[in-house]
């Protein structure tokens, strides 16, 4: 599977502050789900950004995704990250959410991750990791365990 690597990373500490799910309490994960629910209730949809449309390799079942966010007791365990990103001078709260559907990408069973902008319900981008990926290269120095989720 090919990996997309952007030269314009948002992971720089000057552009983004973020909290990884391993640093969150269960209550914080539930708060992230509540923020997603509030976003869907307010905007009535989740919409793919033009950037996301160039990255997506499968069809998203939006009714299944939204149903999972609202009805599944497992939704908090699909929260991967909460972040606040400086996007052209505006602060955007974003959640990375693991889709409940396993997809096959380039012959590899994969999890799909969605970066959802809480300000407008836009799915900013998506990426895929094989289901056996253990994230050995994850650098928690980029994360802030003290970030308040709100």
List where the protein language model places each region.
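Ribonuclease/tRNase effector modules and their secretory precursors
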Residues: 1-150
């Amino acid at each position: 599977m090919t990996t997309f690597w952007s030269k314009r990373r948002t992971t720089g500490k000057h552009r983004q502050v973020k909290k990884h799910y391993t640093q969150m309490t269960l209550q914080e994960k539930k708060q992230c789900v509540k923020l997603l629910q509030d976003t869907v209730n307010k905007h009535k949809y989740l919409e793919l950004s033009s950037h996301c449309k160039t990255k997506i390799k499968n069809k998203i079942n939006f009714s299944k995704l939204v149903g999972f966010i609202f009805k599944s007791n497992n939704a908090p365990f699909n929260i991967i990250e909460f972040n606040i990103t400086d996007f052209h001078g505006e602060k955007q709260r974003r959640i990375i959410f693991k889709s409940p559907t396993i997809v096959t990408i380039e012959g590899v069973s994969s999890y799909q991750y969605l970066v959802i902008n809480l300000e407008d319900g836009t799915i900013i981008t998506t990426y895929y990791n094989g289901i056996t990926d253990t994230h050995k290269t994850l650098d928690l120095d980029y994360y802030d365990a003290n970030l308040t989720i709100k």
